[in-house]
Amino acid sequence: MNEPLASKKIRWKCRRGMLELDILLERFYEEKFRSLTKNEKEIFNQLLDQPDPLLYDWLLGHVTPESSEFKKIIRKIQQLSS
């Protein structure tokens, strides 16, 4: 898949069923996605495959993801929103 198409699909995946997640994820995408490494972009894409309630808990710090890669991206999203 080419980069612009993949990027558009990831942007679309930032749209969730919860307004709070939409705000956090879309802002992160708009402000930080381009500066991520290729690996971080892949991890962010995998993060977006997770269910909304779990993402919500991770982003608000109620639960910590087991994956160290997810933890790094979650921290970046949290830093942007603080």
Curated annotation (Swiss-Prot):
Q: What is the lineage of its organism?
A: Bacteria, Pseudomonadati, Pseudomonadota, Gammaproteobacteria, Legionellales
- UniProtKB keywords: Chaperone, Cytoplasm
Protein known as: FAD assembly factor SdhE
Q: Which InterPro entries match?
A: SDH, SDH_sf, SdhE_FAD_assembly_factor
Highest taxon listed in the record's lineage = Bacteria
Give the function comment from the record.
An FAD assembly protein, which accelerates covalent attachment of the cofactor into other proteins. Plays an essential role in the assembly of succinate dehydrogenase (SDH, respiratory complex II), an enzyme complex that is a component of both the tricarboxylic acid cycle and the electron transport chain, and which couples the oxidation of succinate to fumarate with the reduction of ubiquinone (coenzyme Q) to ubiquinol. Required for flavinylation (covalent attachment of FAD) of the flavoprotein subunit SdhA of SDH and other flavinylated proteins as well.
Q: Name the GO cellular-component terms.
A: cytoplasm
Q: Name one Pfam family in it.
A: Sdh5
Q: Which family does it belong to?
A: Belongs to the SdhE FAD assembly factor family.
The subcellular location is:
Cytoplasm
Q: Got any disulfides in this one, which pairs?
A: none
- Species of the source: Coxiella burnetii (strain RSA 493 / Nine Mile phase I)
What is the protein's major site of localization?
Answer: cytoplasm
Q: Cite a single GO BP annotation.
A: succinate metabolic process
Q: Does the keyword Chaperone apply?
A: yes
Family annotation (SUPFAM superfamilies)? YgfY-like
